[in-house]
Amino acid sequence: PIHVPQEYFDRFPVDKLLLPAGILNDLDDTYLKSADPSDGSGDDKGYRYYKLLEESYGSSEPGIKAFLRAYLAGVAAVDDCIGTVIDAVEENGLADNTIIIVTSDHGWDMGQKGYLFKNTLWEDSARIPMIIRAPGISQAGQRTQQPVSLIDIYPTLIDLCNLQGDTRKNAQGAPLDGFSMRPLLADPSSGNWDGPEGALTMRFAGPKNNH
């Protein structure tokens, strides 16, 4: 959410927050150490946001802590909203035939590498939450080590709902990409997975971000 009630901020006193190890001044493996300020090569949005945060708070640490506090407040608010949805599903007798998926379209770099945005290939940005409750199939609290992608959600829903049909838009088109995660939901450790061993993520390239 863009706006979060103060009560969620109050759950995370800024003086109690600890930054992850190595979050500050960790630029050795980035292009910034050799960027030329005169050619705008360091003017990526994520770096620009980080610099603005530094300027607003006087230094990196208090700025990142304030940002982290707001991020945690947002996560807590969403968590409560998800709980409200689950309660409604259960109270209305829909728990046995309702699939619930909690995910996101991207992660977020929280100041690592001097970057404060999305759209990077670093894990903090490329990795997302993926929680699926499929009645009669998934088991609570189980995890899989198999990487999956957002493009696997639609094939999974088709499979779980026993839907039939052609996923091509027209005769000239190709079937939708992605693979059903049903085997992983049924037994996360089975290794029964038709998809690739890795997950695909992309980062656009251009004159200012071809690094």
Q: In which residue ranges do the predicted regions lie?
A:
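Active-site-proximal cap/lid insertion segments
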Residues: P1-P147, L160-G173
